[in-house]
A protein has these predicted regions:
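Terminal accessory/targeting
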Residues: 1-214
Length: 214
């Protein structure tokens, strides 16, 4: 188990640490706000906050994970170790950006709750996203960051064992409209029948008849 010291355990902190450490890397993570308990812990441990306690493995926080609600935040994306990163922190931190806040920002789709231009279906457009604007939309940056964190943890705590991860592939189909013919209403159905006949789309006309008439 990896023990994390933080002055405040918030739902955001608990969620993102468990996502990275447990769901992605496969190790258990615990939290404490007690300095004595942290210092007495003999196993792998790290602190997360504004300042380190001493010489422990330290990850400096941006501050977003201790806030409540949605607020506009300034983000500067930069290159780091052949990938992208944001929420930069000082060189006191073991990683030069707040990996946990950056991951939470993407996992929670934080930017979609901020004012934005919607597409024709009233949705947040991918073209408005941070990933698209900085050319990492198709890159699994959270996983990349997590496995770079794994290397750091292995170097710092050789006794910390990581299980082999088993992966499965699931196919997803994004359908803007659930049904081609059903639930269109009488008027739109009549328009569809008329359009099929006018354009001689007989197969589609017959299929529409079977679907609409049951």
């Amino acid at each position: 188990m990896l023990l994390i010291f933080t002055k405040q355990i918030t739902p955001r902190i608990s969620y993102v640490f468990k996502h990275i450490c447990t769901r992605i890397l496969g190790i258990k993570v615990g939290f404490t706000t007690e300095i004595d308990a942290f210092l007495a812990h003999k196993g792998p441990k790290a602190s997360y906050g504004k300042q380190p306690l001493g010489n422990e493995l330290f990850f400096q926080s941006h501050g977003l994970l201790t806030q409540q609600g949605i607020e506009s935040v300034e983000i500067n994306v930069r290159d780091w170790d052949q990938t992208k990163c944001f929420f930069a922190v000082s060189d006191k931190s073991a990683i030069p950006f707040d990996i946990f806040t950056a991951a939470f920002y993407l996992l929670s789709r934080y930017e979609e709750y901020l004012p934005h231009v919607k597409d024709h279906l009233g949705r947040f457009s991918a073209h408005e996203s941070l990933g698209f604007k900085h050319n990492f939309l198709d890159s699994p940056v959270i996983d990349i960051w997590s496995y770079k964190l794994k290397v750091l943890l292995q170097q710092t705590f050789p006794q910390l064992l990581f299980p082999e991860k088993q992966t499965t592939v699931h196919s997803l189909i994004n359908a803007q409209v659930a049904y081609a013919f059903l639930n269109k209403g009488i008027f739109r159905s009549i328009i569809g029948f008329t359009s099929d006949l006018f354009r001689l789309r007989l197969k589609q006309f017959l299929l529409r008849c079977k679907v609409v008439l049951g």
